[in-house]
Regions:
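Extracellular structured ligand-interaction cores
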Residues: 62, 144, 266
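Extended, solvent-exposed, turn-rich assembly/linker loops in the middle of proteins
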Residues: 97-178
């Protein structure tokens, strides 16, 4: 505001902020080292140059640790996708009471196609899905430059004539979205552009606790966002007395390997971690469930 140069100025009010505390879910996958596997030839082992049991034991230990870390990373991915697509993370498991982390995503950022607006009900030669996408993107708190979708969304989009006419395959490999996908060829497919909007199909899967394979991102979901909106993964303290004693409570992962005496003695491998993805600004994402 304007004021007289002869009058003392007013102190401006600082911008406010809000803080909150969350309790991350705790993980500690565990495997037993089977001694019978140390006396048998392992996969990839040369029959003419067999390794000794000590080598095989170390290979079992490192292999199990690798699997445990991969399982933890898969859970981080699951948490991140759920945070963006539902606005919440549900934490439940053995020995803990179920609780919810609410990221307070605005209601307009979670969209489900209603009757009359469903893409499955539209004329494939006349309907313009690009107009719908622009309306969805307007709900985000910033301009969208990337659209990540499940396989069903991509198949539906390609069925519209107007989409095929404007879909751009020719642009070079310079976008942040495309570079981010470079090493994820098995589960991520960069399809091209729709104007300035990078199009990515994500088909990553994980194995649930009941042994069934499930998609991280459901095939009928699309997510609009901006590649400059980056979150982070926070980690809770390692809740293990050995970690406390050695000053390792702030680690991302805390691997353990020990032998329990007995008849017979049993050896275990375990990895502790308490990860929780934090959306930087969740209102800048829009999720749409197509029908």
């Amino acid at each position: 505001a304007f004021c007289s140069p002869m009058v003392g100025s007013q102190v401006q009010r600082d911008k406010g902020y809000e803080t909150s505390t969350i309790k991350p879910g705790y993980m500690k996958p565990k495997h037993e080292i089977d001694p019978t596997k140390t006396i048998m030839r392992m996969d990839g082992e040369d029959p003419a140059q067999l390794n000794d049991p000590t080598y095989r034991r170390m290979r079992l230990i490192t292999g199990n640790m690798r699997r445990q870390i991969n399982a933890i990373k898969a859970r981080v991915e699951w948490l991140a996708v759920n945070a963006v697509t539902t606005g919440k993370n549900i934490i439940e498991g053995e020995g803990i009471e179920r609780y919810e982390i609410d990221w307070k995503i605005p209601e307009n950022c979670i969209i489900q196609q209603a009757s009359g607006k469903k893409w499955s009900q539209q004329d494939k030669d006349m309907h313009d899905p690009i107009y719908d996408i622009e309306l969805y993107a307007d709900q985000a708190g910033c301009p969208a430059n990337v659209m990540i979708m499940g396989g069903e969304v991509w198949r539906t989009l390609r069925s519209f004539k107007k989409f095929r006419e404007l879909y751009d395959l020719s642009r070079g490999s310079e976008s942040a979205a495309e570079l981010a996908c470079k090493n994820l060829g098995e589960v991520v497919s960069f399809k091209g552009y729709l104007g300035d909007l990078a199009l990515i199909v994500y088909s990553g899967k994980y194995t649930d606790s009941d042994g069934t394979e499930k998609y991280f991102l459901e095939p009928d979901l699309l997510v609009l966002g901006n590649t400059n909106n980056k979150g982070l993964v926070a980690y809770g303290a390692i809740m293990d007395q050995e970690a406390v004693r050695t000053g390792a409570t702030q680690n991302m992962y805390y691997p353990k390997n020990w032998i329990e005496d007995g008849d017979p003695a049993i050896e275990y491998v375990q990895t502790h971690s308490a990860p929780q993805p934090i959306p930087a600004d969740i209102r800048k994402f829009v999720t749409v469930k197509i029908a």
